[in-house]
Amino acid sequence: MEGLLQFLLAKIILLALASSFVYCYDPSPLQDYCVATNETNGVYVNGEFCKDPKRVTTNDFYTSGLNVPGNTIIGPGARNTVVDVERLPGLNTLGVDIARYDFAPGGLDPPHTHPRGSQIFLVMKGKLFVGFVSSNEYNYTLFTKVLYPGDVFVFPKGLIHFHANIGETNAVVISAGGSQDPGRIIIGDAVFGSKPLIDPKVLAKAFALDYNKVKYLQAVFS
């Protein structure tokens, strides 16, 4: 079983890499690589300055640590460990990302979107209930599935989705996506915890809620 999961993980990463070159949402690079750097005297590409190619090393394309479980004690019982440009500078301009998700029993990654990239899940351990909602063009259709180790599920770019551990043990997922920085908008935080807060009267009317309930939700999320 472990060998099968490793094979599936490798396949997902290869598919994510292949799709990034064909249907990449990030700008297509005009050079082999643009390793991100904090130095500001280089070329600026895709939100980062490029390291001098002559000073690029193997370690610019390497990182470790996805074998370490995330802390699920705080929050809703879910934690993601993201490999981004800060952690892996060689990701810049390549149009891919990878992350580890850890879920405590009953843990939840609340409804959210990734505005700049799609996402694909490979369950390594546990039992997850996942789903996404289509846009108004498709009548806000809800698609859900219960996932087990070895199962793969894809979430289209920009659509609201969620992940919940419905098993009795911890759950682990490896996630890959089609952007080096897909972004993340948690719906509740954005609507009720914006800075500054949205006028409660607007939200009360939009969601058919009592004004005081809106004020309560804003206090919870802000």
Curated annotation (Swiss-Prot):
The record lists glycosylation at 38, 139
* Primary location class: secreted
Q: Which residues bind Mn(2+)?
A: 112, 114, 161
In this chain the Cupin type-1 domain maps to: 64-215
> Does the record bear Secreted in its keywords?
yes
Q: Which residues form the signal peptide?
A: 1-24
One term under GO cellular component: apoplast
Task: Note whether Disulfide bond occurs among the keywords.
Answer: yes
Q: Where in the cell is it found?
A: Secreted, Extracellular space, Apoplast
Q: Which UniProt keywords apply?
A: Apoplast, Disulfide bond, Glycoprotein, Manganese, Metal-binding, Secreted, Signal
Site, as annotated: Probable non-functional manganese-binding site: 119
Disulfide-linked positions: 34-50
The UniProt GO MF terms for this protein read: manganese ion binding
* InterPro entries cross-referenced by the UniProt entry: Cupin_1 (IPR006045), Germin (IPR001929), RmlC-like_jellyroll (IPR014710), RmlC_Cupin_sf (IPR011051)
Q: What family does this chain come from, according to its entry?
A: Belongs to the germin family.
Q: What does this protein do?
A: May play a role in plant defense. Probably has no oxalate oxidase activity even if the active site is conserved.
Quaternary form? Oligomer (believed to be a pentamer but probably hexamer).
The name on file for this protein is Germin-like protein subfamily 1 member 4
